[in-house]
């Protein structure tokens, strides 16, 4: 059986989740249908969002129309926290990957709640982990080839959104090859080639419900072998 001890970031996320559930218990949830936007780049940003159920992807689009997927967030996550920066409008577009239920919290109220529950210091540390993750993604774009970036991306998604099975991690959210290409920084055809290679090497598979199964130890060992 694969076991994993909760990290400080995981523990803080649980504390923040409880705090925000208390803060929003009397407010109605916002229902966002699959493929619909929560907000788009350029919108005013005065609120943070807390995900009750579902998945949200954050995407930035270049002037040439090329998409870069920044992150995928699931139940218990917050997003839209750049409203705390005092910058102009939203820099990214937030889109539901499946039917999603959200709670909306004004930025000032969000900070007040964290302060009330003595979670501000933890929130700063939580954000630094996100920054470190993004720095690693940027470094990988320069130092790691596309196949390795895909493997690392699959492992990151599995860690964040997957469900543990005895010898693998199951990803139930549907992520298209086009979306993976936007995360990895390559083309959809190349993603298809690499995914087929991973399947042939028994590093990943799809179950009868079409969920992606990541064989964590095998994939990690393979990535180490091709450095």
Predicted regions and their residues:
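Glycine- and acidic-residue-biased ligand/ion/polar-headgroup-sensing regions
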Residues: 35, 46-59, 74-76
